[in-house]
Swiss-Prot record:
Keywords: Nucleus, Transcription, Transcription regulation
Major subcellular site: nucleus
Location relative to the cell: Nucleus
GO-annotated biological processes: cellular response to starvation; negative regulation of filamentous growth of a population of unicellular organisms; negative regulation of transcription by RNA polymerase II; positive regulation of induction of conjugation with cellular fusion; positive regulation of sterol import; positive regulation of transcription by RNA polymerase II
Gene: SUT2
Listed name of the protein: Sterol uptake protein 2
MF terms in GO: DNA-binding transcription factor activity, RNA polymerase II-specific; sequence-specific DNA binding; zinc ion binding
High-level lineage: Eukaryota, Fungi, Dikarya, Ascomycota, Saccharomycotina
Provenance organism: Saccharomyces cerevisiae (strain ATCC 204508 / S288c) (Baker's yeast)
TM segment ranges: none
Record carries keyword Transcription: yes
InterPro entries: Zn2-C6_fun-type_DNA-bd_sf
Disrupted gene: phenotype observed: Leads to increased expression of NCE102 and PRR2, when SUT1 is also deleted.
Length: 268
């Protein structure tokens, strides 16, 4: 391209923080010769559009056509590159939530009873996460039907393959105090006195301390049963359905060790 009386029109931006826009004349260049862009920009003086050229501009640009021009050297362009932004962000240190920081105004000693701003935000975020997060294991039958959160307590006190064929022939069996005393030396030597708070249940190869969920306890104080017909844990859900597929019309509470072996599982 070859410059031919190159002129430009200065379009002022409404936002004064932004640089002005320079538009070249429509008939400023011809394609007779090839010229590097760097050579084109070497001419620093520009003249405004002539009246005939202004007629070719859009209506909004015609407003600025009569204004004087300005040299390119007077225009300052801000550096908005990513590398420059990254360098500036690295210089700024922000305190982490719930952690000590160099900014003393953001941090106080939690152990003294005072609460930090960052600790409060962290606590709120943690509580929201807990409310939204689903239960780790299966829910009881009632809560699963109602599609509500089940808060039943399931504590695995002991897991031993010998338990499958011990204590009772049933795979799911609620122990009495006499059963605990009978097998205390073998399985319950370290079991604390929890009979008033938890049910002690033999469940497949586990001894489980179980407490019914709030929903089932309120629904029926007399016969409130919090039932887990698919098992207490996710691993149980792989065992009982397989037994049930071969033994129809038999619930988890009626299955025996013989049913367990008939389904292809081994006791030891």
């Amino acid at each position: 391209m070859k410059p031919n009386n190159r002129t430009c029109d200065v379009i002022t931006n409404k936002d004064e923080s932004l640089p002005a826009l320079l538009l070249p004349a429509l008939n400023s260049y011809t394609c007779d010769d090839s010229l590097l862009k760097g050579q084109i920009s070497s001419n620093g003086r520009y003249q405004p559009f002539g009246f005939s050229d202004c007629s070719l501009l859009p209506k909004r640009l015609n407003i600025q056509a009569g204004q004087g021009s300005m040299p390119v050297s007077s225009i300052q362009c801000a550096d908005h590159s990513y590398s420059n932004w990254q360098k500036e962000s690295e210089k700024t240190k922000l305190p982490k939530l719930g952690c000590p920081t160099e900014y003393t105004e953001y941090y106080k000693t939690v152990s003294s009873g005072e609460t930090t701003d960052s600790a409060v935000v962290s606590s709120i975020a943690t509580n929201r996460l807990k409310r939204k997060r689903q239960r780790d294991g299966p829910s009881c039958d009632s809560c699963r039907i109602k599609k509500i959160k089940c808060n039943a307590t399931i504590i695995i006190f002991l897991q031993d393959r010998n338990l499958i064929s011990s204590i009772s022939s049933n795979l799911h069996y609620t122990l009495s105090q006499d059963d605990i005393n009978q097998f205390r030396m073998k399985f319950f030597r370290k079991l604390p006195d929890v009979m008033g708070t938890y049910e002690v249940i033999k469940h497949l190869d586990k001894i489980v301390l179980f407490k019914a969920c709030t929903s089932c306890s309120r629904r029926n104080q007399k016969n409130g049963k919090c039932l887990f017909s698919r098992g207490f844990t996710k691993s149980d859900m792989n065992v009982f359905p397989k037994i049930n597929s071969k033994l129809k019309d038999k619930s988890i509470f009626e299955m025996t060790v013989d049913d367990y072996v008939a389904a292809g599982f081994q006791t030891l």
